[in-house]
Amino acid sequence: MTTFKSFLLLLCISFSLQAYAQEKVTAREVLSLDKGWSFHKGDIPYPVIKGHNATYRNAKAGCVSGAASPNYDDSSWRIVDIPHDWAIEGRVNPDANLSQGYYDRGFGWYRRKFKLSPEDKGKHLELQFDGIATHATIWVNGTVLHRNWCGYTSMYIDITPYATYGDDVNTIAVRVDADAQEGWWYEGAGIYRHTWLVKRSPLHIITDGVFAHPVKKTESQWEIPVEVSLYNSGKLTADGEVEVTLLAPDGQPIATKNQKLSVKALREGIANLPITVTKPLFWSPENPVLYKVKTQVKQNGTVTDEVETKCGFRTIRFDNNTGFWLNGENIKIKGVCSHQDHAGVGVAVPDALWEFRLRKLKEMGVNAYRVAHNPVAKEFMAACDSMGIMVLDENRLFNTSPEYVRQLEWQVRRDRNCPSVILWSVFNEEPMQGTENGVEMVRRMYDVVKKMDPTRPITAAMNGGFFSEYNVSQAVD
């Protein structure tokens, strides 16, 4: 009998390992979730929970009550598409905040339902919000998964453990607190940038996970020290191969590098694949030449994930006496400082409008743009790259606590491949700029940025404190 039980145990283990070894291997899908959100303007109070059984249940994952619950009746809510700014839909209120354009903001709720095919089971599923104004709490299928503390940063939320498949419906609920103000300008209200659902194989490239910024080595030789960050959401160690190919502006391959690696379950792995390039074409405002780095993950000869990252070859240098140098040429920076909102749409700016605005600025002779005073939409950054607008990329919140360091890291990771970015700015006009506390904060933010991108100078937009014994100019480039 003991021998028979041992045989059954080994048989079960064998079947189990076979099931784990056959993990889903598929190509990446990026699906827009912009259409068909249910929207309620105003807050909906959480229900008062009384009694032991109700209180016990309410404390459990997936059992939230009220408007965040999958079972909540939202049939009377209005249907809207994203990007959406509910503040600009209202009327000007003379009693509202001047700095917010005399528009009321307040609270709002969004809900959206979607189904997943049984074929999606085993994939890594990521919910992405490009921007919500301002603070937000996000639930999926009754479990709170994310709290957002900045209206200008993106959210990448792993919903894999919470997803349901087939006929079961998945429910996203978002409570937006737009009374939380971060700036002294019109900030809008709501889910005002795009939303996405990204499906990937268990072994995949993480979002913003390719660093491919060219570095000049000699007069004619350049190197792209490509760094690829991967994650394995599967149940077993995953073996794979990372391949990067540099594509010329006309799409022709220039160079390819490969690296095999093994990533344990629920761990990250990094592949480093430096590519050498001779005499590339330079990126500039007059001729914004863009190359592409195509990154593929292969398993058993099959491409399981792929992303293309645009990059540009250019050198930058600032000199105390002569000013700014781009590609060895002394040029004048003719820039503007502008916020993201636009007449009629508020902060829910259509993608085509970014290019329209930049085109008008170029017609005026502008070659540079300071984002005021926060990370902008990724579509705007892509337009600056392709249209030849140099960017001073500025952080929103001056704070070195863990949450705000995470926001700064996100910004650098997303934008560090952009040839348009010539400077990082860690703050704008902060009262602590002429104090020892301010210096210590900037020192730490400077270190965060330099570790992630050693190629660009770091500044801060001071408007005072220049002659204080301690001032932040001592801690930046």
Locate the predicted segments by residue.
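Bacterial Sec-dependent N-terminal signal peptides
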Residues: 1-24
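N-terminal carbohydrate-binding accessory modules
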Residues: 24-28, 209-211, 294-363
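Accessory beta-strand-rich segments of carbohydrate-active enzymes
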Residues: 40-44, 100, 104-208, 233-234, ...
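Signal that preferentially marks extracellular ectodomain short beta-strand elements
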Residues: 157-163, 272-288
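Substrate-binding/catalytic cleft of secreted carbohydrate-active enzymes
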Residues: 358-360, 368-477
